[in-house]
Amino acid sequence: MRMKKMSAVYMGLFCMLCTVSMADVLVPYLPAYIHGSSWWQPKPGVSWQWQLSGTLDTDLDVDMYDVDLFDTSASMISLLKSQGKKVICYMSAGSWENYRDDANVFPEEVLGKYLDGWPDERWLDISRIDILGPIMLRRMDLAVEKGCDGIEPDNIDGYSNDSGFALTSEEQLTYNRWLAEAAHARNLSIGLKNDLDQVQDLVSYFDWALNEQCFQYDECDLLLPFVQAGKAVFGVEYSLSTTTFCSQANSMNFDWLKKNLSLDSWRVSCR
C-alpha cells in the first residue's frame, strides 16, 4: 500500500527520527539526581576490597569496597560509608542471572547462550537497548536508593564472546557508553570491567577500570590509558602467586589483589 504524501515539516521530523538510535532516545530522559561531575573519580593508589560471597568483612582498613548490589543491604552500605569508605555495587549489565530478583523481567528474545563455566548465566543481546535499557536503569536506581557510590557493570564484552548473537564492536561501544552516561546522570561512578580491546575508545567515558587476570594472560598494557589519564586501575589474579605479578603491578601503578575465584573475604594486596 502506497503511503500518503507527507508534508515537508512531517517529512523532516520523520527523517530526523530515523537517524536517532534508541540509546539517543533514552539518554535525554535519564534523571540527573545531582548536576555536575561530582561522582567518585579515583586516582591510582586506592586501597580496596572486592567481596561478592560469604559474610562481608567490614573491618578492613581500605578506601573502597566492591560488593554485590542485590545481596548487600542498604544498612550494610551505610555502615561502610560511615567508616569513610566508598562503596561500589556489582551488577551484571551483559548477562542474565537466573537467581536475581528481576530475572523474570528479561524477555526470552534477549537471552543468548550460557556463559562458559557459569550455568546460571546467559549472555544478553546488548544491541536491544530498547529492552535492556529500562531494566538496567532500574538497577542503577536501586544502587542510588541503597547509597552506592558507583557501579561495577560486569560482562560488557559480549561482542567478543560466543554470545549467541551477532554483536558488533560498535554495538558494544554504544551500549557501554550508554551505561556510563546513565550512571553519571545518577551521580554514580562507573568502572570499565575487562573489555580490554575497547579501552582506547572508552577510557574517557569510564572513571576507573577493573580487570581479572591480565597478568596471567599478558594483556595488562592495554589498561595503561587509564593510568595515563590519572584514573585508577583495579584488578585481581586468581592463579598466579603474588611474587609473579605484584612488583609489575606496582610499577604500572595498578591496584592489584590476589583473590579466591569465589571472591570471598580473603585477599592479599600488592600495595
Where are these regions (language model features)?
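Glycan-processing catalytic domains of CAZymes
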Residues: 30-271
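Short, cationic, amphipathic peptide segments
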Residues: 26-28
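Bacterial N-terminal signal peptides that target proteins for export
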Residues: 2-10
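Bacterial N-terminal signal peptides
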Residues: 10-18
